[in-house]
């Protein structure tokens, strides 16, 4: 593995809030979004020979274009599974759906920003031209929509769910361009959403210290007609020093210095990695962690204190802000702790570090630190799983290049997915780790580092810098 910076001004020195790779693209195209109200398109030029131990470094970048129809900062961008529609959303409260313009399309079809004609528009200088296909707005009017922090596509690309600053999530029908429903069950900003790849549930994570599980309501024709709140995960009975069980909060409160809490569901739908976790180490002293739930744990949860995670990944020096699974499946080299017939890889980002794990051993394969001066905002894996891109509020992006065959083993075809819960023998997991008090286990035998989460008690809209 090799980590490096990409030293360019991605968004005119403004923060970079989100990034994503275009799926099913013949080229390595990266899209970034930031505080300059623009989405920008880049082509990654790699070392195809892999002269650095099989690692394909990014040698240079080509700028391909800017998308300029947002009126305020853009917080999230995501492609649908086909890779032909890009969704972007941000502080202006609208979701824009972009499609690449056919070179044979007449110039008059391009929707230009107000006040710009064909001669003055920045769009005419782009190597690629993307047009706004649809605009999605929540609320009853143009000014009623709240700021959007995160979004997720449905697996069939028919719907989009967004996380809003007014404590709600909103569900849109992409084809109709209409709002299907909204849910206002959270007590604070919603900072992350994820859609189950098997289309059974949606997860939303909020600054109110909870994760909500919503069941997806489908019509007989398979059309999403609404959402139903299944459970709220906020507290659980967790093992504490002295082999006792105590009811504690699972997640950080609103003082967490980040816009985002981006949880991630594995591409098979069997695992959920949830950031911003905390746990008691002694008295009122808390430490940072990440919680891992199985699919059955999510679907069968009642939302009570006994809804314990399957695994706790502890000993993070700073709060975890987001997680992201690689889309690639690998042959398992040994018996998986979770009894998976394949190996998955995921990354966790704290405010100042990125850690890469696999599901075989659940120990860090690498820890990348001191890469940014201010908090990390997003993670994006390339389609082949060989590159992990990282964005930050310092206005820069960095990356980790990986020789996947050496680090992870041979790739396999994705297994056939079905909508039945994944059964996990949690007692076997507990026995393996010699833990009998409770269903949550520490997989990493490393020193626990307390979190200084009490340094700041004020409520904030914008994150404040942290000391690295």
From Swiss-Prot:
It holds the Pfam family Beta-prop_CAF1B_HIR1. The keyword Metal-binding does not apply. Its main location: nucleus. The keyword Mitochondrion does not apply. WD repeats lie at residues 11-52, 69-108, 143-182, 185-224, 371-413. InterPro entries: CAF1B_HIR1_beta-prop, PTHR15271, WD40/YVTN_repeat-like_dom_sf, WD40_repeat_dom_sf, WD40_rpt. One of its GO terms (cellular component) is CAF-1 complex. Disulfide bonds: none annotated. GO terms for biological process: chromatin organization; DNA repair; DNA replication; DNA replication-dependent chromatin assembly; nucleosome assembly. Present with 2130 molecules/cell in log phase SD medium. Component of chromatin assembly factor 1 (CAF-1), composed of MSI1/p50, CAC2/p60 and CAC1/p90. Interacts with RTT106. This is Chromatin assembly factor 1 subunit B. Acts as a component of the histone chaperone complex chromatin assembly factor 1 (CAF-1), which assembles histone octamers onto replicating DNA. It performs the first step of the nucleosome assembly process, bringing newly synthesized histones H3 and H4 to replicating DNA; histones H2A/H2B can bind to this chromatin precursor subsequent to DNA replication to complete the histone octamer. Plays a role in the maintenance of heterochromatin. It is found in: Nucleus. Belongs to the WD repeat HIR1 family. Keywords: Chaperone, Chromatin regulator, DNA damage, DNA repair, DNA replication, Nucleus, Repeat, WD repeat.
């Amino acid at each position: 593995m090799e980590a490096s910076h990409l030293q360019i001004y991605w968004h005119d020195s403004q923060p970079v809030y989100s990034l994503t790779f275009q799926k099913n693209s013949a080229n390595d195209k990266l899209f970034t979004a930031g505080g300059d109200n623009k989405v920008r398109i880049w082509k990654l030029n790699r070392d195809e020979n892999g002269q650095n131990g099989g690692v394909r470094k990014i040698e240079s970048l080509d700028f391909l274009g800017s998308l300029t129809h947002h009126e305020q900062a853009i917080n999230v961008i995501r492609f649908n599974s086909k890779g032909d529609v890009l969704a972007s959303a941000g502080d202006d409260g609208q979701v824009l759906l972009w499609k690449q313009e056919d070179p044979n399309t007449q110039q008059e079809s391009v929707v230009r920003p107000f006040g710009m004609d064909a001669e003055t528009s920045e769009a005419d200088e782009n190597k690629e031209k993307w047009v706004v296909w649809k605009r999605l707005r929540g609320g009853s009017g143009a000014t009623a929509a709240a700021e959007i922090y995160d979004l997720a596509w449905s697996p069939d690309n028919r719907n989009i769910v967004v996380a809003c600053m007014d404590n709600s999530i909103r569900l849109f029908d992409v084809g109709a361009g209409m709002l299907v429903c909204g849910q206002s069950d959270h007590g604070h900003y919603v900072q992350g959403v994820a859609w189950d790849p098997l289309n059974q549930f949606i997860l939303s994570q909020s600054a109110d210290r909870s994760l909500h599980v919503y069941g997806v309501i489908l019509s007989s024709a398979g059309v999403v007609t609404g959402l139903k709140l299944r459970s709220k995960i906020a507290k659980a009975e967790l093992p504490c020093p002295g082999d006792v069980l105590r009811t504690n909060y699972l997640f950080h409160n609103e003082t967490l210095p980040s816009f985002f809490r981006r949880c991630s569901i594995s591409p098979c739908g069997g695992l959920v990695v949830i950031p911003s976790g905390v746990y008691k180490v002694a008295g009122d002293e808390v430490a940072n962690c990440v919680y891992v739930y199985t699919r059955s744990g999510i679907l069968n949860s009642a939302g009570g204190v006994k809804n314990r995670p399957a695994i706790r990944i502890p000993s993070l020096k700073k709060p975890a802000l987001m997680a992201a699974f690689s889309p690639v499946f690998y042959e398992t080299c040994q018996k998986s702790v979770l009894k998976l017939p394949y190996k998955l890889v995921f990354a966790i980002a704290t405010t100042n570090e990125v850690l890469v794990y696999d599901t075989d051993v659940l120990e860090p394969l690498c820890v990348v630190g001191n890469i940014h001066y201010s908090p990390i905002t997003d993670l994006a894996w390339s389609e082949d799983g060989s590159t992990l891109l990282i964005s930050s509020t310092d206005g820069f992006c960095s990356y980790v290049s990986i020789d996947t065959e050496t680090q992870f083993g041979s790739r396999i075809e994705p297994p056939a997915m079905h909508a039945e819960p994944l059964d996990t023998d949690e007692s076997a997991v507990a026995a393996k780790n010699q833990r009998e008090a409770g269903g949550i286990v520490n997989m990493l035998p490393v020193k626990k580092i307390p979190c200084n989460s009490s340094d700041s008690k004020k409520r904030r809209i914008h994150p404040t810098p942290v000391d690295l």
